[in-house]
């Protein structure tokens, strides 16, 4: 049994050697204590070793959304900033591809009012796509100035086309000048050609002179008319100023009612509510608590009576000018003191002078309001 098992084992080992190659199967050796089985497989020199898989290059992604390109998300290069964008983040326009940021700024035609309406994020993104630092920009206006300053960086095609057109125009003008300079007309037609040129020049000059003279004449007439109109306007203004100086209350009387318009108490009853309120407001009388017309009439009657009494007392005091009177206004020294200045509460002026005061003449405090007072 042992001899049969040994021969079977040897035949199996020989078969494996033929299949795997010589030395592919080795018995368990003492130098390999880590082996657990009776066989140890080693790579044969007959089989080639494959190189390791090459590491993939840097994955290119879209500059706008950050997603990698694929079959469904194709890569496009912006014609302005020359950066890579996907089909969703770029706009096709006249067989050219622009990213959404460049397209947005291109729509504004780089006009300052239109650029100021854009978001700061779009302006900053436009500058970053062109590798322009924006660290020093603190306001939106700084970004707009930076865009306008560097707008020539993205318009190389336009510059090239403009330079090409200018060079073409220069070359064409050069050729035309050279042709006309080298051309010599026949001697028989030189005199006739010069005569035609002189006739045309003379006619053209005469037409130009006629147009210039007509324009000068029309301009002079227009200037004369304008001067006449200005003189008329100045005369009208002078007349109006003279009328206002002679009657300073005329324009105000037309606009608002005044206490001086009243000649008697009977006229107060015929006035409207608006006129009554205007009279009270001009004399600094508060009518906020008045709900009926008769209340306004009563206040205007009282104001009118007090005004008449003040005028009578003023006429009497004019006869006694030498006597000192403490009830006269300290500003004009003509009218009676009938006004209190708020917030200080001093009574030193009349109503007319009080409404012109910006500060109290006694305490120098700012005058918030001047209020007419009635003497009891």
UniProtKB/Swiss-Prot annotation:
Induction annotation: Down-regulated in response to cold exposure.
Main location: membrane
TM region(s), chain numbering: none
Pathway noted in the entry: Protein modification; protein ubiquitination
Region Disordered: start-end pairs: 216-256
Organism of derivation: Mus musculus (Mouse)
Compositional bias of kind Acidic residues: 221-246
Catalytic reaction equation(s): S-ubiquitinyl-[E2 ubiquitin-conjugating enzyme]-L-cysteine + [acceptor protein]-L-lysine = [E2 ubiquitin-conjugating enzyme]-L-cysteine + N(6)-ubiquitinyl-[acceptor protein]-L-lysine
Site positions per UniProt: Cleavage: 236-237
Catalytic class of the enzyme: transferase
PTM statement from Swiss-Prot or TrEMBL: Autoubiquitinated (in vitro). Proteolytically cleaved by caspases upon induction of apoptosis by TNF.
Gene that produces this protein: Rnf34
Quaternary structure (record): Interacts with CASP8 and CASP10. Interacts with p53/TP53; involved in p53/TP53 ubiquitination. Interacts (via RING-type zinc finger) with MDM2; the interaction stabilizes MDM2. Interacts (via RING-type zinc finger) with PPARGC1A. Interacts with NOD1.
Function: E3 ubiquitin-protein ligase that regulates several biological processes through the ubiquitin-mediated proteasomal degradation of various target proteins. Ubiquitinates the caspases CASP8 and CASP10, promoting their proteasomal degradation, to negatively regulate cell death downstream of death domain receptors in the extrinsic pathway of apoptosis. May mediate 'Lys-48'-linked polyubiquitination of RIPK1 and its subsequent proteasomal degradation thereby indirectly regulating the tumor necrosis factor-mediated signaling pathway.
GO biological process: apoptotic process; cellular response to cold; negative regulation of extrinsic apoptotic signaling pathway via death domain receptors; negative regulation of signal transduction by p53 class mediator; nucleotide-binding domain, leucine rich repeat containing receptor signaling pathway; proteasome-mediated ubiquitin-dependent protein catabolic process; protein K48-linked ubiquitination; protein ubiquitination
Stretches annotated zinc finger (FYVE-type): 56-107
Places the protein is found: Cell membrane; Endomembrane system; Nucleus; Nucleus speckle
SUPFAM superfamilies, per database record: FYVE/PHD zinc finger, RING/U-box, SAP domain
Protein name listed in UniProt: E3 ubiquitin-protein ligase RNF34
Modified residues (Phosphoserine): 169, 258, 260
Domain SAP: 115-134, 268-282
Cellular component GO terms held in the UniProt record: cytoplasm; cytosol; endomembrane system; nuclear speck; nucleus; plasma membrane
């Amino acid at each position: 049994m042992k001899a049969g098992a040994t021969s079977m084992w040897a035949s199996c080992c020989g078969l494996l050697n033929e299949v795997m190659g010589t030395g592919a199967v080795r018995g368990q050796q003492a130098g390999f204590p880590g082996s657990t089985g009776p066989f140890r497989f080693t790579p044969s020199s007959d089989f080639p070793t494959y190189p390791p898989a090459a590491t993939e290059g840097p994955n290119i992604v879209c500059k706008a959304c950050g997603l990698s390109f694929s079959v469904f998300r194709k890569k496009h290069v912006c014609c302005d900033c020359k950066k890579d964008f996907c089909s969703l983040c770029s706009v096709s326009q006249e067989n050219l591809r622009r990213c959404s940021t460049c397209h947005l700024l291109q729509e504004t035609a780089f006009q300052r009012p239109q650029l100021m309406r854009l978001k700061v994020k779009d302006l900053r993104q436009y500058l970053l796509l062109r590798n322009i630092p924006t660290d020093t920009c603190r306001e939106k206006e700084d970004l707009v100035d930076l865009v306008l300053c560097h707008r020539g960086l993205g318009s190389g095609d336009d510059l090239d086309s403009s330079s090409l057109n200018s060079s073409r125009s220069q070359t064409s003008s050069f050729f035309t000048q050279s042709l006309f300079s080298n051309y010599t007309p026949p001697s028989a037609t030189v005199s006739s050609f010069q005569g035609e040129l002189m006739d045309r020049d003379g006619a053209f000059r005469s037409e130009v002179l006629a147009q210039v003279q007509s324009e000068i004449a029309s301009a002079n007439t227009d200037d004369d008319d304008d001067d006449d109109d200005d003189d008329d306007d100045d005369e009208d203004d002078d007349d109006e100023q003279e009328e206002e100086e002679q009657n300073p209350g005329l324009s105000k009387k037309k606009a608002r009612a005044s206490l001086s318009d009243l000649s008697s108490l009977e006229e107060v009853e015929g006035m409207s509510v608006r006129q009554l309120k205007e009279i009270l407001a001009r004399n600094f009388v508060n009518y906020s608590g008045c709900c009926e017309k008769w209340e306004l009439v009563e206040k205007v009657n009282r104001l009118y009576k007090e005004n008449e009494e003040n005028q009578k007392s003023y006429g009497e005091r004019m006869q006694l000018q030498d006597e000192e009177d403490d009830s006269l206004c300290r500003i004009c020294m003509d009218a009676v003191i009938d006004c209190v200045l708020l917030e200080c509460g001093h009574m030193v002026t009349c109503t007319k002078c009080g409404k012109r005061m910006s500060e109290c003449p006694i305490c120098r405090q700012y005058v918030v309001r001047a209020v007419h007072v009635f003497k009891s």
